[in-house]
Regions:
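Amphipathic C-terminal alpha-helical segment
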Residues: 96-100, 136, 140, 159-178, ...
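Basic, helix-initiating cap at the start of DNA-binding domains
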Residues: 1-26, 30-35, 39
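Amphipathic alpha-helical packing segments from all-alpha helical-bundle domains
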Residues: 74, 118-144, 153-157, 164, ...
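Amphipathic alpha-helical linker/stalk segments
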Residues: 61-87, 106-109, 119, 130-143
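N-terminal intrinsically disordered/low-complexity leader segments
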Residues: 1-10, 74, 201-220
Length: 220
């Protein structure tokens, strides 16, 4: 790679990182040419030498953030037993990522993407991000007969909608319960869906203990 290409990639990286930092800390409303340029350490005119507009940058951030989420899930589940246990752990790790970075959640699920040139690609990445980070375990569960192939898409859809709904209420502070209760409810709804749709009740020989001020049960 020539020196000019190396410099170009480095400067692009500065602008991309500046945009990601703004999105994580302050949300999409803070993202404008001047803010990005100031944080990157360049003039705003320089940005247009490397990107067509802010939408180009934001789309790259969506793609990068999805990669970060996928890596987070992988790192936090690699020691879990394959199958339902790792599937549950993957869903929790996905939730934990967005609890840690609510600005990314807002970008993914609350902002209007109508002005995105690559709206279709961005929407696909975002909408099915939970399915994708769990894809290996869904396939494993089907291959081992833990889940029926005919039911998997329905289960995915139900878990996706329930998980995102719970996250939206929590991150937007529409509910007053603490993080521990969020995880309790996540496990309850995930197990309820798996048990109602799978031949073995989504059982893998283990269980999840769930406790709060109102309930104390063991979901198997």
């Amino acid at each position: 790679m020539k020196n000019k290409e190396i410099q170009e990639q480095r400067i692009k990286g500065y602008f991309l990182q500046a945009t990601k930092d703004l999105l994580k800390s302050e949300g999409l409303q803070s993202v404008n040419v001047r803010n990005i340029a100031d944080r990157a350490g360049y003039s705003y005119a320089t940005l247009y030498n490397y990107f067509k507009d802010i939408n180009d940058l934001v789309f790259l951030c969506v793609y990068d953030f999805y990669g970060e989420c996928e890596q987070h899930v992988r790192e936090h589940t690699k020691r879990q037993e394959r199958g339902i246990k790792r599937l549950r752990a993957s869903i929790r790790a996905y939730v934990d990522f967005f609890v840690q970075y609510p600005g990314i959640f807002s970008l993914f699920f609350m902002e209007n993407l109508g002005s995105f040139k690559d709206k279709g690609r961005a929407t696909e990445i975002i909408s099915f991000s939970l399915d994708k980070v769990c894809e290996e375990e869904w396939n494993y569960c089907v291959s081992k007969g833990i889940l029926q192939v005919e039911q998997v898409e329905l289960i995915k859809s139900q878990i996706r909608h329930a998980t995102l709904g719970l996250l939206m209420l929590y991150i937007n502070q529409r509910v007053s319960f603490p993080y521990t209760e969020l995880i309790n409810r996540l496990y309850l709804q995930t197990n309820a869906i798996l048990e109602s749709c799978s031949p073995g009740g989504g059982r893998d020989g283990g269980g999840v203990s769930v406790h709060n001020s109102l309930i104390s049960i063991k979901v198997k």
